[in-house]
Structure formats: C-alpha cells, structure tokens
Amino acid sequence: MIFKDYDFLQNYDLKNFEEKVKIYKELLSKFNRIHNLTHLKNIDENIFDSIKILDFYDFSKAKNIADIGSGAGFPAVFLAFLLQSNFHLFEPNPKKAAFLRTLKIECELPNLHIYKEKVQEYKNTFKADIITSRALMDVKPLLEICKNLKDENTVFILWKGSEIYQELENIKDYEIFENNLRRYCILK
C-alpha cells in the first residue's frame, strides 16, 4: 500500500510509518504461524481502516489514548506509529498481549503501554482523552466497562459496522463518518 497517496497523511512521517508497518507485518506473520492471532486476510486494508480516522478527527490534543480489546493492534498500533500521544492498550489475551509487547520493543515505541488485563479490572492512574475500540462490543456495555478511564472530556472513537445506528439509541452527542462499510463513530 502506498500511504503517500493519501492527502490526510501528508503531515506525518510516512517513511518511519512504512518502516514500522513492515516490522509489524513480519512480526505478525511469525506470531500468526504459532499463535493464530488474527484471521484477517488483507492486512493493508485493515491498516488503512485503522488510520483513516485521521481524515475525520484531530488527535493532536490527545495526551492519553486508551484502546480497549487491542487484539493484534488494530487500530491503536498504527495510530501510535503516527502520533506522539501515549497509547494504553488493554488486551487480556496473553498471546496477543505478548505480541503487542514484542512489537513495542521491535518498533521502539516508548509511547505504547500494554496491559494484559480487562479494562474494567484496571486500577487507573490516568484519564483517557480518547478511548478507541474496534468492533469489540456494543456501545453501551463498552461505555460502562470504561467508566474508570473516562471523565466528562473523554471522547470515544469506535470502529463499527452498519449496526451502529441501533446501538446508539438514546445516545445524543455523536457523529458518524462513513468509509465503504466502516462507520467511524465519535461519541462526546
């Protein structure tokens, strides 16, 4: 995938990003042979899906970003490749958390913090400016399990499908941006 062709990425260090993406793909291939971390077939499409939100939302003021159910790193890892924010990834699966820790070391990402626990069990020391999650669970239960990380200024950015409209019943302050079948939902 040629990232320089996308206007919304022009203000980022794409050479560094592409180097880290290469390391990510190699590491994922190694881990996947043994641990079967993900069934995704087109990694490039999923990387693009992870960073496309930068076309819709300005992350520049976010100091702490929490990602819930990080799995193989989509979307948080790729945002961490581009942004200076501190990323706090919550992934209770030991194999996936080990992959993320290895990736942090291999890509030299001091802004990436991995927690091998469920977010609702975390004894927080920070409040997140942004909480992200990609297709983990319905909106309302997600809001509930994240209550220890949020305050009145926290923004949720969710990667969802077309079902998002039903999930937002009785929720008032949100925006949805569409890209193909993806719905990027921003809850304020």
From Swiss-Prot:
The Gene Ontology terms for molecular function here are:
rRNA (guanine-N7-)-methyltransferase activity
- Cell compartments where the protein resides: Cytoplasm
Q: What does this protein do?
A: Specifically methylates the N7 position of guanine in position 527 of 16S rRNA.
The organism sits in which domain of life? Answer: Bacteria
Where is it mainly found?
Answer: cytoplasm
User: Would the keyword Iron-sulfur be found if you checked this record's keyword annotation?
Assistant: no
Recorded E.C. number(s)?
A: 2.1.1.170
Membership in a protein family:
Belongs to the methyltransferase superfamily. RNA methyltransferase RsmG family.
Q: Which UniProt keywords apply?
A: Cytoplasm, Methyltransferase, rRNA processing, S-adenosyl-L-methionine, Transferase
How is this protein annotated for GO cellular component?
cytosol
Q: What residues bind S-adenosyl-L-methionine, as annotated?
A: G69, F74, V119, Q120, R134
NCBIfam families in alphabetical order? rsmG_gidB (TIGR00138)
Lineage of producing organism: Bacteria, Pseudomonadati, Campylobacterota, Epsilonproteobacteria, Campylobacterales
**Gene name, Swiss-Prot/TrEMBL:** rsmG
Which Pfam families does the annotation name? Answer: GidB
Provide the catalytic activity annotation: guanosine(527) in 16S rRNA + S-adenosyl-L-methionine = N(7)-methylguanosine(527) in 16S rRNA + S-adenosyl-L-homocysteine
**PANTHER family in UniProt:** S-ADENOSYL-L-METHIONINE-DEPENDENT METHYLTRANSFERASES SUPERFAMILY PROTEIN
| UniProt-recorded name of the protein | Ribosomal RNA small subunit methyltransferase G
Residue ranges crossing the lipid bilayer per the database entry: none
